[in-house]
Amino acid sequence: MRIAVMAGTPMDTKLGVNLLKENGFTQTISVPISNNPVEQTTFQSLEEEEREQYIRSVIDGMKNEIDAVFVYCNSLSSVVNFDKLEEEYKLPMITPMQMYRTLGVEHDYLAVMAANSHGLTGVENNLYIANPNLKVFGVTMLELVKAIETGKPQEEIIKQFDFQSLFHYFESTEIEAVVLGCTHFPYVKTELQQLSNIPIIDVGVYM
């Protein structure tokens, strides 16, 4: 199966390719939509028609060479209706947003760490589809995305953003789990797990 890995930047595209390879899918095409996090956030701020038109042009250029599209970017999949495009192109399109529609059923209170407001809104909306009574504590961290893009060691990033204090706050509330609402964030998942007993949810493993 030939899979196009579409993501916001070259970094999360690479992370998506690595995730697929770990699960036995080796025939991939890398399709980063932007060169860096700021450029991607700017793209997400365009009018809906402009965003969709650009994504269509990308899909049109490769649709005869692929069997599926793996959208490994929360915020991108929250601002483009890939469900509609999947039906139109008759091409499987897997996105993180689809995973959140079942995740919300299992919890009453979640913390969501997202890259920007676009991603956070998309995650929240899809969680609420499954559970309208769910409580969500949302945090947006574009600066964390930028730090990960530099390839800085995980432990340095954890200290830079003082995640110890953030997770201490989470522990003082009734938050049941922390959702990594950005596909960059699994980069620091191992270090985050050492800070607390609160479960870390990475929807990428379910995609």
Give each language-model segment a name:
Residues M1-M207:
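Non-catalytic structural scaffold of enzyme domains
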